[in-house]
Amino acid sequence: MKTRTQQIEELQKEWTQPRWEGITRPYSAEEVVKLRGSVNPECTLAQLGAAKMWRLLHGEAKKGYINSLGALTGGQALQQAKAGIEAIYLSGWQVAADANLASSMYPDQSLYPANSVPAVVDRINNTFRRADQIQWASGIEPNDPRYVDYFLPIVADAEAGFGGVLNAFELMKSMIEAGAAAVHFEDQLASVKKCGHMGGKVLVPTQEAIQKLVAARLAADVMGVPTLVIARTDADAADLITSDCDPYDSGFITGERTSEGFYRTHAGIEQAISRGLAYAPYADLVWCETSTPDLELARRFADAIHAKYPGKLLAYNCSPSFNWQKNLDDKTIASFQQQLSDMGYKYQFITLAGIHSMWFNMFDLAHAYAQGEGMKHYVEKVQQPEFAAAKDGYTFVSHQQEVGTGYFDKVTTIIQGGASSVTALTGSTEEAQF
């Protein structure tokens, strides 16, 4: 076990590495170690994911940038890994709607239990672990061309932290324990938090938003994991703020008050840039939430951030809340992500891809099945396309194998001394027909 002094010296040395260039910590290594306790458990999946995410952002991504899809189940994340996606995005919106621990359906207003997103991170990582175990038990190793690296980095949504700085600190720790690689925090008031594409958003003072980023970084340092911190600002659209206490915000406050006591602000890109510049020293990536897929707006934000912080990584929400074809022509849509990447937006994601795909495809199947010729539509819309997708690496046609039946047959056989009459795949319809 390392002594307190050894841990402090090790941490001080770590912070001089290129990984931390441009990152401000308003606390000391001694203060971090003081909060750790005598035993600091390792968070292997979080460590692995954070390191992968950092490498992807710095040249290893196939396209030169990471483009993620939102997932809300382990199975969705598994299929993304098989299909070649390089990182998973887990949005609070999707968790609120269909994957929270209250077992209810909510809008994106931080109404669900605060430990719900960490629970889904854990569930996705457990699915990755099972898929990896199945692959490994089948004799497929990393040097095999059939090998799939299932342990994709997970970028998780912490919303506005579900409270104050202590809530943000504890939530970040829970995310890391579950295996998140990166976590984002937004600058809204947690008690009335809204989806970035809703009205009624209320900002907290810039200094308070910074303190939540510091809380997140401190939590990661206490856990001993280089988790990426992503700072999101909603200041492009939000025209309310809780207080005029922070001089940094004074240039945007109009003087008008609301019935709740909030202050009106001048929403827009200048307010967003101001916030982005304030957050940049405390975050690994900066994200400006926008109302439309606007390349010029994205360029203005990127140019302003990079004028003061050259090379600062940026994130962009390619949201389903945008009507893409209403805003852009097909050619621009096709080149949109590459153009963003050229501006420095190296992490791009479709927040609600998982839930839109899941709900639409079920409606499409159910409508045809209910209105038409029954099994014909299941075969045409699901089974035959699944067979056709096998050439691209899709394997869920053999659904018993996919979820681990063969793996647990191996467990049974080992326990029973090498022979068993109760294994599940032998004699199954999958063995006979697929």
Swiss-Prot record:
Pfam families: ICL. This is Isocitrate lyase. The keyword Magnesium applies. It comes from Salmonella typhimurium (strain LT2 / SGSC1412 / ATCC 700720). GO terms for molecular function: isocitrate lyase activity; metal ion binding. Belongs to the isocitrate lyase/PEP mutase superfamily. Isocitrate lyase family. Keywords: Glyoxylate bypass, Lyase, Magnesium, Metal-binding, Tricarboxylic acid cycle. Substrate binds at S91, G92, W93, G196, H197, R232, N317, C318, S319, P320, S321, T351. Mg(2+) binds at D157. Involved in the metabolic adaptation in response to environmental changes. Catalyzes the reversible formation of succinate and glyoxylate from isocitrate, a key step of the glyoxylate cycle, which operates as an anaplerotic route for replenishing the tricarboxylic acid cycle during growth on fatty acid substrates. It comes from the Bacteria. It catalyses: D-threo-isocitrate = glyoxylate + succinate. Changing A390G: In strain: S3041. Homotetramer. PANTHER family: BIFUNCTIONAL GLYOXYLATE CYCLE PROTEIN (PTHR21631:SF3), ISOCITRATE LYASE/MALATE SYNTHASE (PTHR21631). The active site is at C195 (proton acceptor). GO terms for biological process: glyoxylate cycle; tricarboxylic acid cycle. Pathway: Carbohydrate metabolism; glyoxylate cycle; (S)-malate from isocitrate: step 1/2. Its cofactor is Mg(2+). NCBIfam families: isocit_lyase, PRK15063.1. Its EC number is 4.1.3.1.
